[in-house]
């Protein structure tokens, strides 16, 4: 019965409909919405690692719930104007050049980026800390019906990994989303190259580079605020370590457990996304919505509203 209802083959009776609403703790108005389900950027994950289909579907559904909430909020308030530079790798050049261009367009000064989340949100892209229910999923991007990008990042990750994930997803938005991509291209590698150059410009990295050791990697992590592993990989890509040095340092990191958890003294605090929360507060503090009214507008219950 439920399977046929889910597939649209059967229409539930009023009694069954009420039961479903009560069990799932959603008001009837939630199921009466006519919103389309948008597929997020899942194809890249399918190519990279194995994730159970049910985990993907659950993530997709939850992401769409957040998207619908945002779209409802945007009927009353405006987001910062969208300023998303677009880049065609086949026409304009390598992902690293795209990252340099974004830094220029967004007027990011030299050196490390102190708060990438704020810069992204200031340019009209919503960042949503999100529980994917799987540590295998770092982040995903999705475009709202009004063409506003939303980046979801795994809220269970450490701050350095969140920053790299944000930059990685931004790379997909800048270079891939909505573009025709030849199958021969490795979009995951391109997004990582973009992220690495955005967060750690090669010219500055090389200028300050010392002899590579675990200690120097830790000190560089403290400054650049991305993982020791990512910095070691960048050094290899820039031919600053030999293959043997690279393997040896990775073996040392694995032996010390750094591949799963890097030393606490180099921890990077997670950045705080504020745009979604500010939209909610604007409705209650300035537009005069009560919690019940706001919950009704979003087609959720007050308990779920408080959890946003």
Annotate the PLM regions.
Residues 1-308:
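Active-site hotspot residues in diverse enzymes, especially metal/ion-binding acidic/histidine motifs
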């Amino acid at each position: 019965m439920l399977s046929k209802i889910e597939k649209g083959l059967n229409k539930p009776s009023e009694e069954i409909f009420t039961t479903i609403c009560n069990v799932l703790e959603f008001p009837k108005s939630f199921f009466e919405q006519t919103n389309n389900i948008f597929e997020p950027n899942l194809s890249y994950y399918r190519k990279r690692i194995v994730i159970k289909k049910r985990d993907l579907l659950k993530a997709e559904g939850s992401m769409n719930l957040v998207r619908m909430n945002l779209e409802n909020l945007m009927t009353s308030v405006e987001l910062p104007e969208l300023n998303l530079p677009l880049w065609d790798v086949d026409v304009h050049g390598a992902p690293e050049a795209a990252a340099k261009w974004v830094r220029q367009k967004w007027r990011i000064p030299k050196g490390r980026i102190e708060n990438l989340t704020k810069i992204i949100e200031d340019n009209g892209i919503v960042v949503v800390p999100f529980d994917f229910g799987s540590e295998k999923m770092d982040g995903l991007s999705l475009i709202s019906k009004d063409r506003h990008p939303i980046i979801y990042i795994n809220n269970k990750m450490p701050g350095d990994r969140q920053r790299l994930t944000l930059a990685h997803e931004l790379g997909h938005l800048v270079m891939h989303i909505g573009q025709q991509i030849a199958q021969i291209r490795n979009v995951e590698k391109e997004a990582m190259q973009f992220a690495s150059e955005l967060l750690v410009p090669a010219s500055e990295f090389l200028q300050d580079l010392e002899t590579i050791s675990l200690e120097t990697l830790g000190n560089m992590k403290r400054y650049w605020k991305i993982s020791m592993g990512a910095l070691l990989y960048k050094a290899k890509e820039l031919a600053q370590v030999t293959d043997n040095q690279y393997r040896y340092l990775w073996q040392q990191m694995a032996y010390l457990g750094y591949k799963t958890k890097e030393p606490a003294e180099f921890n990077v605090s997670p950045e705080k996304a504020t745009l979604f929360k500010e939209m909610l507060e604007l409705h209650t503090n300035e537009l005069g919505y009560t919690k019940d009214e706001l919950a009704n507008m979003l087609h959720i219950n007050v308990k779920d509203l408080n959890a946003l």
